[in-house]
């Protein structure tokens, strides 16, 4: 705005200056004799004439862009033969005569009727002639003169480009030339400073600078790194009037890239491509190809394609085929012929790599327009929603309407639609659908606790073309009703300590219980805990509802004893918050246990009373395990010995040795000299090295219950061994063996002593072995060998 005011003021000043000069010129033409044909009057009005006849005029000037209301007076033509009687007629011809410049044929005044622009035309050449008005006879020969258009500063500087793109190698030295921007001013460079330009940088410091006179942009910082910042935006200003105040200015933007460039940008061979795609095409299908040619090779010839604009930018995409350097246009989303039948894309091809040796070839990219038409196709039905969600109450009767799906044919034919359920998604056939209107109904009552959501798929197909089919997911939520009573959240069990005092454990907390309900939260909490009405005043225990879906069980009294009752069953009623509420009775088992002085549980089994005072549960388990292992070993060994077959031994006299061997095992060989000593079973307390102390009174003593004390361990072992011996003696099928089975524990009062060797039968020893006859068939061989001769003879 300030520059416009300055321009208007300058125009007014120049106009006034011109009129004063024209007036002065006209006066000089009358006063100075240097102008030919000029009349001059003296003070008394006498006309003085020069000796030489001719034109009295000068070179004329007119200011450009004059916008006054009256035509501009350019100058005046006058001949010295003009006496002022009107007989002379002035004629003007030449450039602009009669259109731009007009002359008063009587006075010779020349006016400019149009606004002149020096930038369009700087001067006009005209021809003047004086003729007789009546006869048109030339009175003087034609004379040529020039009208010059005087310049004013009415044109700002203009750059050759609105936006410049330049590249410079990264890490260049300070002062490295980047690019030169050039501006031109249409004003007269020979007149004043209207066309004298000075360049300056408005944006881009401190990275770049510009030479004020040449417009060369240079780097101002060293070691600029492309990896840190690749692109810079610089604004350059060019100002006329030598950069002084009042001058006009113009700006340009320079984008400087710290990267390599190549010398050939890609170019499309044509400006428009025509393509087509069917509305039945699926996303990813190729629509067409475009190709921008780049004469460079290698990495400098690689081209990438992008869709930069267009109404189909969301429906189509373009990829680069690096083998052929083609831009492949593909379908990104389905198109609909009935919605829109044509799309337009603006595709840009750009180089991947830029060569730093060629920085003045401009931007390395090109654009092309691609027009894509959509072809009609028979489309399947289209559901009004991409998915459906319906709700139904659980336990609803068969035939209850769940909801509806709706589809229509998008084609102009608008074919009727038939609906069906994908039975792969409804294997239990919970639902059925009306094929004509799409209403979904139940076929049986549903249970939310089994399945809260049911997901099925519904098909919609054209009645005349079953292949045109569409599927939509339908989610059915089963709404909850209060059909499940709450119950214990876990199998709870309570414990209470024995006590002698009846009030010792009064109000003692025993256990905290919580509940769980399979129904939804709306029909679940808050749970209410209570005792059944019939035992509301239970003398032993009470239930206190904590009002947080838990309840505490407390003892009403003390004096619990395992001898009297070792456990109690407490029924607890739990009600939920549903409408109507449901309840269930749950039984809590409370065991009476032995505790130490601190209340810690020691044992909750009533059988603990029958155990010895100093024997722990771990010791009992160890003893029982040892007994079982020994019994298994004995049974296995006896079984193996019974199955063993040995040849009949023939004793020779020289084989008898004079020694007696004592066998402590059941084995019959000399190598079996070790036996299992089960004497420790006579004292179970000594198994683990623990002997009860008699000098200290135990803190807890178990009182044995009459009639439940087990028999001593020794009796059990005796019975077992004697039973096995009787079975062996009475087995008629058992073959005879030459070895005797010796048991490590033979019972009380065994009359059998040590056996001598076989040689003792032939010695003169007074040993009597007649008792072998009483040992049964297994010892018959020994009885025959060692018996007395009389006995032998009697048997024989």
Curated annotation (Swiss-Prot):
Residues in the Extracellular compartment per record: 54-617
UniProt KW keywords: Calcium, Cell adhesion, Cell membrane, Cleavage on pair of basic residues, Glycoprotein, Membrane, Metal-binding, Phosphoprotein, Repeat, Signal, Transmembrane, Transmembrane helix
GO biological process: cell-substrate adhesion; corticospinal tract morphogenesis; focal adhesion assembly; homophilic cell adhesion via plasma membrane adhesion molecules; modulation of chemical synaptic transmission; negative regulation of cell migration
Modified residues (Phosphothreonine): 791
Keyword Nucleotide-binding: no
Any Pfam family: Cadherin
Sample GO molecular function, one term: calcium ion binding
InterPro entries the record matches: Cadherin, Cadherin-like_dom, Cadherin-like_sf, Cadherin_CS, Cadherin_Y-type_LIR, Catenin-bd_sf
Phosphoserine: residues bearing it: 788
Cytoplasmic side: 641-796
List of glycosylated residues: 455, 540
Signal peptide: 1-24
Residue ranges of domain Cadherin in the record: 54-159, 160-268, 269-383, 384-486, 487-612
Cell compartments where the protein resides: Cell membrane
GO CC aspect terms: cytoplasm; glutamatergic synapse; plasma membrane; Schaffer collateral - CA1 synapse; synapse
Membrane topology, from the record: Single-pass type I membrane protein
Assembly information from the UniProt record: Interacts with PCDH8.
Record note on domains: Three calcium ions are usually bound at the interface of each cadherin domain and rigidify the connections, imparting a strong curvature to the full-length ectodomain.
Function: Cadherins are calcium-dependent cell adhesion proteins. They preferentially interact with themselves in a homophilic manner in connecting cells; cadherins may thus contribute to the sorting of heterogeneous cell types. Required for proper focal adhesion assembly. Involved in the regulation of cell migration.
Listed name of the protein: Cadherin-11
Species for this entry: Mus musculus (Mouse)
Lineage: Eukaryota, Metazoa, Chordata, Craniata, Vertebrata
Gene name of the encoded protein: Cdh11
């Amino acid at each position: 705005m300030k520059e416009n005011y300055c321009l208007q003021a300058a125009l007014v000043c120049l106009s006034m200056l011109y009129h004063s000069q024209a007036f002065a010129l006209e006066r000089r033409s009358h006063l100075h004799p240097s102008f030919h044909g000029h009349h001059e009057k003296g003070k008394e009005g006498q006309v003085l004439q020069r000796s030489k006849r001719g034109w009295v005029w000068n070179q004329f000037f007119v200011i450009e862009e004059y916008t006054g209301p009256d035509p501009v007076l350019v100058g005046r033509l006058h001949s010295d033969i003009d006496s002022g009687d009107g007989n002379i007629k002035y004629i003007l011809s030449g450039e602009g005569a009669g259109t731009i410049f007009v002359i008063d044929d009587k006075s010779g005044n020349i006016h400019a009727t149009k606004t002149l622009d020096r930038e369009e035309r700087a001067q006009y050449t005209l021809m003047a002639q004086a003729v007789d008005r009546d006869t048109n006879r030339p009175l003087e020969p034609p004379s040529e003169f020039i009208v010059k258009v005087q310049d004013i500063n009415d044109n700002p500087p203009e750059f050759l480009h609105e936006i410049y793109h330049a590249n410079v190698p990264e890490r260049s030295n300070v002062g490295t030339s980047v690019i030169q921007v050039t501006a031109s001013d249409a004003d007269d460079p020979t007149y004043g400073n209207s066309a004298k330009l000075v360049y300056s940088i408005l944006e881009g410091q401190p990275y770049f600078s510009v030479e004020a006179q040449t417009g060369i942009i240079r780097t101002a910082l060293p070691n600029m790194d492309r990896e840190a910042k690749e692109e810079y935006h610089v604004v350059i200003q060019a100002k006329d009037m030598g950069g002084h105040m009042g001058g006009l200015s113009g700006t340009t933007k320079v984008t400087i890239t710290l990267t390599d460039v190549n010398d050939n940008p890609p170019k499309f061979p044509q400006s428009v491509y025509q393509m087509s795609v069917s509305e039945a095409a699926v996303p990813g299908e190729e629509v067409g190809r475009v190709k921008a040619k780049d004469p460079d090779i290698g990495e400098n010839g690689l081209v990438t394609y992008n869709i930069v604009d267009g109404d189909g930018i969301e429906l189509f995409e373009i990829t680069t085929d690096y083998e052929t350097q083609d831009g492949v246009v593909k379908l990104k989303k389905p198109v609909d012929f009935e919605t829109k039948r044509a799309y337009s894309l603006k595709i840009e091809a750009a180089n991947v790599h830029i060569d730093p040796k060629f920085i003045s070839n401009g931007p390395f990219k090109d654009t092309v327009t691609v027009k894509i038409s959509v072809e009609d196709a028979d489309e399947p039905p289209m559901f009004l929603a991409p998915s459906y969600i319906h709700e139904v109450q659980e336990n609803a009767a068969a035939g209850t309407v769940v909801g509806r799906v709706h589809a229509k044919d998008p084609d102009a034919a608008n074919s009727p639609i038939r609906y069906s359920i994908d039975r792969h998604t409804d294997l239990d056939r919970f639902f059925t659908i009306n094929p004509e209107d799409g209403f979904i109904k139940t076929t049986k009552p549903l249970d939310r606790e089994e399945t809260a959501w049911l997901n099925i798929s519904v098909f919609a197909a054209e009645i005349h073309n079953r292949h045109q089919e569409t599927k939509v997911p339908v989610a059915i939520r089963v709404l909850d009703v209060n059909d499940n009573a709450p119950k214990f959240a876990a199998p709870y069990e309570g414990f209470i300590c024995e006590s002698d005092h009846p009030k010792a454990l009064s109000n003692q907390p025993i256990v905290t219980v919580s509940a769980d309900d399979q129904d939804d939260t709306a029909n679940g909490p808050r749970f209410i805990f209570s005792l059944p009405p019939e035992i509301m005043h239970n003398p032993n225990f009470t239930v206190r509802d904590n009002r947080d879906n838990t309840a505490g069980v407390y003892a009403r009294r003390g004096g619990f004893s395992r001898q009297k009752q070792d456990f109690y069953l407490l029924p607890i009623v739990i009600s939920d918050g549903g409408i109507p509420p449901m309840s269930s009775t749950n039984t809590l088992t409370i065991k009476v246990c032995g505790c130490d002085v601190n209340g810690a549980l020691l044992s909750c089994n009533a059988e603990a009373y029958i155990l010895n005072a100093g024997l722990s549960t771990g010791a009992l388990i160890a003893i029982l395990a040892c007994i079982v292992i020994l019994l298994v070993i004995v049974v296995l060994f006896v079984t193996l010995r019974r199955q063993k077959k040995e040849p009949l031994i023939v004793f020779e006299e020289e084989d008898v040795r004079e020694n007696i061997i004592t066998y402590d095992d059941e084995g019959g060989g000399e190598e079996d000299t070790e036996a299992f000593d089960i004497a420790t079973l006579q004292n179970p307390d000594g198994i683990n090295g623990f002997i009860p102390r008699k000098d200290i009174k135990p803190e807890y003593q178990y009182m044995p219950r009459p009639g439940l004390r087990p028999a001593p361990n020794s009796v059990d072992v005796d019975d077992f061994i004697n039973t096995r011996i009787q079975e062996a003696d009475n087995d008629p099928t058992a073959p005879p063996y030459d070895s005797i089975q010796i048991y490590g524990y033979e019972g009380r009062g065994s009359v059998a002593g040590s056996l001598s060797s076989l040689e003792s039968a032939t010695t003169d020893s007074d040993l009597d072995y007649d008792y072998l006859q009483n040992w049964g068939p297994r010892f018959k061989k020994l009885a025959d060998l060692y018996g007395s001769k009389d006995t032998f003879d009697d048997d024989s």
